[in-house]
Amino acid sequence: MIPINTLFIAGHAKLPTGMAAKNVYDSLTITAEIDKKYGVILEASCTLATEHGRDYVSSLLRGFSLQDGIEEPIRVLQHHYRGRAANALAAALKDLHLQYEHLKGKT
């Protein structure tokens, strides 16, 4: 059996009212495949309503190491993503980082 060197984690946050995604989801979720050794985000996805938005957020997050903290990915996200879900995305990222820290403490 080949060892899997990644983790799959998720962060959640409430969506603001009036968002298209709010009609489908009550919360916004960011999921990420993380390299176990270095904490690097290899792939990320979120529950924004449009594929374009999901792809854009994924491209912004890819390559950051959660071992370095979550401040820089949040700063980059807030600088480049100007949609109504910006605060929810930042909160979901903080929750994702919290999940990572919790899992890291168990391994």
Predicted feature residues:
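Active-site- and interface-proximal helix/loop "cap" or "latch" segments in soluble metabolic
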Residues: 14-15, 19-31, 36-107
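Short, compositionally biased leader-like segments
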Residues: 1-12
